[in-house]
Amino acid sequence: MFIKASLDKSKVVKIRKKYGIPKGNITYTDLDKPAKPLFSAKHKLVGKPDYIVKRKEGHIPVEVKSSSVEIPYKSHIMQLAAYCLLVEDVYNAKVPYGIIVYGDRQFKIPYSNILKTRLIITIDEMRNCLRTNGRLKEKA
């Protein structure tokens, strides 16, 4: 039992170092083994962040990307925002920010009301596009 606990701790330390995952309790991981998807009935949204870290300030979703970039892609920010929304709903928890890890750097993305609103609008637009077979609504 002691050896297994030590190996698990050693593995966690390596994962944290490799991906720059902040200190805190890792409550969810999908990167090193498949995990059950998170589902928000309220927003009809499903997703699997790579990690969720529970810290004093709240739950922090972490998304790991294989590419290296100077600034985060807008699509990756929206993906992270979706994970923030899922964590907020599923865990009924405060989500102050999320983290996107690219190669040797990471970006802390604040989960603001503006980002949440932009995400919900984008989800609504995507659903409308699916309902109308890709046709956009005409603006008055």
Language-model region placement:
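Metal-dependent nuclease catalytic regions and adjoining charged, substrate-binding loops involved
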Residues: 32-46, 89-140
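A short, polar/proline- and glycine-enriched secondary-structure boundary/capping micro-motif
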Residues: 71-75, 119-120
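N-terminal signal-anchor transmembrane alpha helix of single-pass membrane proteins
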Residues: 1-18
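Conserved catalytic cores of phosphodiester-cleaving nucleases, focusing on short active-site segments
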Residues: 45-70, 79-85
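Short hydrophobic/aromatic-rich motifs at helix boundaries and adjacent loops
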Residues: 6-8, 21-23, 54-57, 95
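Active-site metal-binding core of divalent-cation-utilizing nuclease and nuclease-like domains
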Residues: 24-56, 75
